[in-house]
């Protein structure tokens, strides 16, 4: 049986994203004991008690020569709230990632929608594979905001109308746009996160240029900031070696 929809839900609009580190087991020392078991066997356990700063050269060597598996023995879980179109891109990253997302079958979806902020460049110039984004005019910004908000309101009214008529949530949700906010938990390790950051952020130190959509880059930047605090030596080696995942 479908629940009666709440009458007081009014659409709200956001131009930001939420990223929170909710759980972690991640430190530079994790890289060291994982790497040293190759040559030290059981004695690699001694790395658990040592200051990883003394072995930052090893971390840099592993990153530079792309010995990747030692960077997998750690874990970070993030809570993320972002538009559905961001999650469409995010979940293309499958190796080293686990996801659980809010369900539109099991709960009534809240009317929170994405509208680009003033800093979001709106106009694409150039051809596929060679283009840039430039600032939109004031008229384009106003048009984008107005049309998006009107469209979101109409879509959510249709969703509510179907729910009120007894239509199942899993059917009614079909009218909702990809600008609707969803939420999920995403768990990764440092290696899988570095691969994500190499593709989904732009950075002056990157050997291989990437051209991510700005909204997923916003998520990536927040995740990167949290990871940098947990594994500063690994993070420094990542940047020093061109932001290419090992």
From Swiss-Prot:
Domain called ThyX: residue spans: 17-241
InterPro entries assigned to the protein according to its UniProt record, in alphabetical order: Thymidylate_synthase_ThyX (IPR003669), Thymidylate_synthase_ThyX_sf (IPR036098)
Keyword field: FAD, Flavoprotein, Methyltransferase, NADP, Nucleotide biosynthesis, Transferase
Pathway membership, UniProt: Pyrimidine metabolism; dTTP biosynthesis
UniProt-listed Enzyme Commission number(s): 2.1.1.148
Cofactor note: Binds 4 FAD per tetramer. Each FAD binding site is formed by three monomers.
Needed co-factor(s): FAD
Methyltransferase keyword on record: yes
Catalysed conversion reaction: dUMP + (6R)-5,10-methylene-5,6,7,8-tetrahydrofolate + NADPH + H(+) = dTMP + (6S)-5,6,7,8-tetrahydrofolate + NADP(+)
Flavoprotein recorded as keyword: yes
Name this protein carries in UniProt: Flavin-dependent thymidylate synthase
